[in-house]
């Protein structure tokens, strides 16, 4: 559970006077009274409930467990797989010689076997193939599932029922399979919290983030996906990752009641950041040391911990900045330090939004930030409510700090006032209103399902400009897609892309520029046709047949696989357009 999700849920509950459930899947959460702990800590509103899959299952009666609908025919012999029980713990595990999980048995609070989760169904002792079996008190099989995804979906069906509901997913891990949870009565929303690329410094068409690859390829399967900033939304829209289902809803921040007129030591800087490579704290230390070397009084207090602490400690000593920079480690409620600080630094390589920037501004503390993707440039007006510096430019960062230190008191007070005013755009009320606008715009209309749709290649040709594709589509039913795309995915790595296709009766055409596939320098790609409806999404693997005509080049070989599907093999290095 992220702090952002807790704060948003509490804001929904408080401002809209509604009950909100936070759903968790981890077995480690079973038996932990996190709801009570969080409420006592003031982290959640009294109308917010923390609900855990395993806490539910281990306390439910057989009558309620039977509401969990399986997706495969029950095999009674599954009971023979039970592990010997070695104690009174609710879990028994079986692992291979390398410590990889092969089986987990879970027990009901009443003491009887509840679940057997085997993950070596293809060959015992080797991971591969899964079967999750749910048992009743009489130890007879209630239901079975071949995947954790189907198992989780069955639980969600019981939890949500038939009433209209809004399901907001904050987890990339869950997002990678929850996009398949489509129910007419559930509006499904995905929140993209961080950079969509595997390498934030890569070109826009580079590999997608591995931990998000499952859901980034299926954004149109959600009713709506939110980004935290307009700039990230624009970047994702330029790649056609979504057909108009992306929208911006920022994180909310607390009103810290920063006083622009409050006297503060001008030289006092603060920074809240993990001490990790992503946060690039070494640049902040170097900049402070440079400013101090020019006989300007300046200090920096850094709050946070992480793997880089030993390196940063050595750097502080080598820069003779022990009296200038202090590493405080993790401190609860560190954002309150901004109320007495004059300026803050952000030197990250990338951000989802940069919540710490909003916290600084809310406190009237002037942010001096690298203009990285994504966040600072969406929030800060340079020279008005803060300062923006080219990413990685330590000298530029030093210059910005020096500029701030040299401003008149009147200029600084005005800047603090502007910072607080800008932060107010992200306080709880306006962001909850924005969520209300986004969710109320969604529909509970029946979801269009076209599992039988078929797309077949007519011609596919590698030209000087790219790949020219013609195909025919059939069996899509009565509903017409509002948009169609040809998509491709690399078999290795996390490369994915799509371009919009055009339709003339049953003929579909698309042009894929070489530049879109340029980052894939070697290997195989598979092509599909994406059908996007107002509410509904289907990805159809494009088939080849005996009449399909393929024209390849020495760099890209187009062909039909042994299973009769349209694929390509990139033989050489990056393809470039000659147009």
Model-derived segments and spans:
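Donor nucleotide-sugar binding/catalytic pocket of nucleotide-sugar-dependent glycosyltransferases
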Residues: 187-191, 196-197, 204-257
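Conserved donor-binding/catalytic core segment of Leloir-type glycosyltransferases
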Residues: 260-279, 285-288
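Conserved acidic donor-binding segment of nucleotide-sugar-dependent glycosyltransferases
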Residues: 382-383, 387-394, 402-409
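C-terminal alpha-helical cap of glycosyltransferases
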Residues: 403, 428-452
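Short hydrophobic beta-strand element within catalytic cores of glycosyltransferases
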Residues: 366-370
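Aromatic "clamp/platform" in nucleotide-sugar-dependent glycosyltransferases that forms part
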Residues: 330, 349
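Basic, ligand-binding patches in group-transfer machinery
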Residues: 445-579
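A short, well-ordered alpha-helix in the C-terminal region of glycosyltransferases
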Residues: 321, 337, 410-425, 437
């Amino acid at each position: 559970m992220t702090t952002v999700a807790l704060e948003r849920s509490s804001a929904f509950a408080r401002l809209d006077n509604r009950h909100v459930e936070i759903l968790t899947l981890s077995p480690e959460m079973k038996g932990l009274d996190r709801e009570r702990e969080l409420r006592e800590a003031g982290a959640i509103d009294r109308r917010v409930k923390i609900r855990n899959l395993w806490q539910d299952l281990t306390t439910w009666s057989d009558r309620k467990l039977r509401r969990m609908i399986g997706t495969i025919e029950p095999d009674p012999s599954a009971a023979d797989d039970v592990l010997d029980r070695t104690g009174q713990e609710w879990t028994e595990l079986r692992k291979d010689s390398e410590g990889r999980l092969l089986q987990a048995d879970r027990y009901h609070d009443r003491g009887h076997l509840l679940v057997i989760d085997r993950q070596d169904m293809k060959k015992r002792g080797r991971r591969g193939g899964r079967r999750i079996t749910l048992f009743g008190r009489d130890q007879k099989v209630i239901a079975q599932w071949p995947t954790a995804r189907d198992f989780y979906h069955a639980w969600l069906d019981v939890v949500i029922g038939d009433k209209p509901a809004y399901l907001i997913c904050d987890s990339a891990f869950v997002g990678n399979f929850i996009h398949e949870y489509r129910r007419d009565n559930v509006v499904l929303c995905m929140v993209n919290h961080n950079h969509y690329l595997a390498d934030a410094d890569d070109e826009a068409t580079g590999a997608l983030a591995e931990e998000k690859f499952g859901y980034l390829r299926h954004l149109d399967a959600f009713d709506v996906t939110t980004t935290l900033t307009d700039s990230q939304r624009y970047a994702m829209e330029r790649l056609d990752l979504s057909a108009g289902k992306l929208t911006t809803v920022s994180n909310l921040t607390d009103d810290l009641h920063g006083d622009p007129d409050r006297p503060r030591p001008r030289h006092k800087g603060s920074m809240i950041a993990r001490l990790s490579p992503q946060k690039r704290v070494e640049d902040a230390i170097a900049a402070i040391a440079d400013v101090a070397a020019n006989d300007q009084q300046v200090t920096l207090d850094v709050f946070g911990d992480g793997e880089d602490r030993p390196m940063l400690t050595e750097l502080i000593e080598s820069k003779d900045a022990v009296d200038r920079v202090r590493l405080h480690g993790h401190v609860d409620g560190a954002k309150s330090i901004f109320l007495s600080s004059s300026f803050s630094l952000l030197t990250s390589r990338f951000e989802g939004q940069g919540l710490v920037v909003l916290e600084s501004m809310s406190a009237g503390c002037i942010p001096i930030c690298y203009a990285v993707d994504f966040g600072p440039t969406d929030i800060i007006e340079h020279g008005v409510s803060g300062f923006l510096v080219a990413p990685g430019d330590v000298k530029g960062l030093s210059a910005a700090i020096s500029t701030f230190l040299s401003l008149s008191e009147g200029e600084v007070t005005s800047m603090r006032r502007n910072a607080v005013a800008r932060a107010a755009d992200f306080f709880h009320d306006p962001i909850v209103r924005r969520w209300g606008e986004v969710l109320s715009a969604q529909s509970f209309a029946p979801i269009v399902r076209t599992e039988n749709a078929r797309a077949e290649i007519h011609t596919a040709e590698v030209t000087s400009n790219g790949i020219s594709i013609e195909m025919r589509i059939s069996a899509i039913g009565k509903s017409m897609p509002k948009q169609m795309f040809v998509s491709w995915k690399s078999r290795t790595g996390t490369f994915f892309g799509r371009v919009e296709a055009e339709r003339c009766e049953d003929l579909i055409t698309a042009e894929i520029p070489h530049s879109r596939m340029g980052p894939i320098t070697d290997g195989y790609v598979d092509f599909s046709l994406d059908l996007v409806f107002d509410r509904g999404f289907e990805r159809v693997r494009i088939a080849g047949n005996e009449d399909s005509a393929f024209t390849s080049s020495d760099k890209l070989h187009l062909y039909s696989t042994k299973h009769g599907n349209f694929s390509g093999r990139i033989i050489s290095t990056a393809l470039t357009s000659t147009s």
